[in-house]
Amino acid sequence: RKGNILLACLDESFVYNRKSCLFHQLFGLWTKEWIYLGSTISGQEEIYIFIDEVQLIEEWEKSVNSYSQDYTEEYELFISGSSSRMLSGELATLLSGRYVQFPVYPFSYQEYTEIRHLEQNRESYMGYMNTGGIPELFVLPEKQEVQRNYLSALKDTILLKDIIQRYSIRDPRLLEDLFAFLVGNASNLVSIGNIVNYFKSQGRKTGYDAVAAYIGYIEDSFLAYRCERFDLRGKEILSGTAKYYINDLAFKNFLYPGTAYGVGYKLENLVYLELLRAGYDVYTGCAKEKEVDFIAWKGDRTIYLQSTYMLVYEQTVRREYASLEAIQDNYEKLVVSLDDFCLPSHEGIRHVRAWELHGLL
């Protein structure tokens, strides 16, 4: 019940004290006879404590470890933050075997249709693709200017608080331009060297180390994901080039609509995110000089996937299927598209309509 839940959002402007003692003060709230809204807590009931942006508390790892070992109190502790490094280093060592991690993503297509009360079909999938899954978009007025202003503020907040302030960025303009570059080139193979050369061609002075570090920070803040390239013949990850996918297509749709980015690239981005949500480790692959959009592993399951806008033309069918036919094993092979119809299976390769992919994962 509501009285048994304590939620603390530490990124709020009124939270001035972020010393380690703040942790003890938060836990002290529910040991009193009152809690938020005056609800009382029975000693027999379990308490749920949610602390958002916990990394803002000094030495928070030690505090979390301390309370996770307190078996005299009945509570469940949930911590969240906007950095992929939260569960690396000291915290992972301190809490080894005593935590469960839940990656959180923007709304999926299934959640989108549920909220909008829509049937799952091509029309609603295109609507999701052209809107995105950022939760706030579902409560804002459906006016592009309002939505664009919100997403611009969200992007600026993430870049400022999660990256610029945290890592003392010297060139904030380069950071923002790199994010715009990743949005505009999502689903394409790129390398740090390519990116450096691009900026130099635009008259920007920058170096390999700075670009690599800034892109790493963008990844750490979950604004974009790096998808490594895997050689199916050599069974190894290839260094150099990789693909990047953005956290949500809303950033593309509302902030950078002018960049060259077709429906096929958007679909590939959505398929990648769907695989992540389903818990797969995802790579982009190559086999016998042919590219495979995705190699996905989860446990003992392996799936190869190609994504393409439409399979209307025979040459498109041959191209997409040829990459999968070149793989000489018996693992699942899927071609995902936005066609209204489904092609019959061919050489063990199954055609899937994009809005039905979730049910197969």
Q: Could you describe each region identified by the protein language model?
A:
Residues 50, 76-82, 103:
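Structural recognition of the conserved hydrophobic beta-strand(s) that form the central parallel beta-sheet
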Residues 302-312:
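Active-site ExK catalytic segment of metal-dependent nucleases
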